[in-house]
């Protein structure tokens, strides 16, 4: 769980945003982390960002999540913002780790994944980008279980990349 890829977040070029060594304090971590919650009548809005990739990639990471209070729907937006114009392209992955009891089916256009809970509730994860499913591990009370993760893959451009996604009950 020390690796960024073990979390539901953006990872640039399979690089961790922090390093932890047993017996030592953090030797690398984001210097600036911001987080804000707004609770409105119909939605709850979460916004966060960090500069964990600033030194190596000259990029800031932002995530915005909107939860609709009266509907079973969540909207998300992950942004990679370049602070220095460059022609270099960087591969990124946005990972969403699932609980072990969730079953999945990806649609033929690879833009939607149907999620089914143990209690037979059906959810649809949607993205404008192509989605993939990969193996993952769930850790609970010193035991591990195999599970899956939803992955959005892309390549950064020189200014700003925005990936929009949503999950809703159907």
Question: Model-predicted segments: where are they?
Answer:
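CBM-like, beta-strand-rich accessory domains located in the C-terminal region of large
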Residues: 1-170
